[in-house]
């Protein structure tokens, strides 16, 4: 596994533990209603704690479109 796959895997586990459903890297989280505002905050806080990054509130919806988009943001912040 390369570092990007590991990142997708770790973020995927965080998302799945909060939404209690299996998600793929490109599963549309917000558009499908899988993630609502409360779970978006939970995911954001968990990702920030796990990876030591900060996701500005106005950008949460943009970066929580999918596991892949969230992983890309986290990777860019490292």
Protein language model features and the residues they cover:
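Phosphopantetheine-dependent thiolation modules in NRPS/PKS and related acyl-activating systems
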Residues: 2-35, 43-45, 49-78
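Two-component histidine kinase catalytic core, primarily the HATPase_c
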Residues: 39
């Amino acid at each position: 596994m390369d570092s990007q796959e590991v990142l997708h895997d770790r973020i995927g586990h965080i998302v799945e533990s909060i939404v209690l459903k299996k998600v793929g890297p490109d599963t549309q989280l917000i558009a499908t209603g899988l993630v609502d505002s409360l779970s978006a905050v939970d995911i954001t806080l968990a990702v920030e704690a796990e990876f030591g990054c900060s996701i500005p509130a106005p950008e949460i919806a943009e970066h929580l479109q999918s596991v892949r988009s969230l992983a890309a943001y986290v990777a860019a912040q490292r």
